[in-house]
Amino acid sequence: RVGVTGGSYGGYMTNWIIGHTDRFRCAVSQRSISNWISKFGTTDIGYYFNADQNQATPWINHDKLWWHSPLKYADKAKTPTLFIHSEQDYRCWLAEGIQMFTALKYHGVEARLCMFRGENHELSRSGKPKHRLRRLTEITNWFEKYLK
């Protein structure tokens, strides 16, 4: 029994992999990216981030953005997934997690969304202690539910 988790780029890869294999019994996607089109120009990294990561923009080779978006493959996902996002994350916006969460629910996949108010992209490293504890509890409970 194997689970998968990742945050930020690892969250993107978690979203990606659940749409490409059913190998994992469960997943935890943290502060993730699901849609390169909607993410364009919204990150605090800078306007160049999408073009750098995908060699595409909404105006140039825009199909490539969709092909690289985990949301495109959400209809193939079967893995129960917990999404963890912070409301004040300006690197990987909450909407990215909500899109993937909603897509999984729409396609009948068990999913849970856990949002943290007053936290940002650094929740796991420098968030409020009570929120860091809750995050770890949510992850542990999810893995225990599906991996036992």
Report the location of each language-model feature.
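Active-site-proximal cap/loop segments of hydrolase catalytic domains
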Residues: 1-148
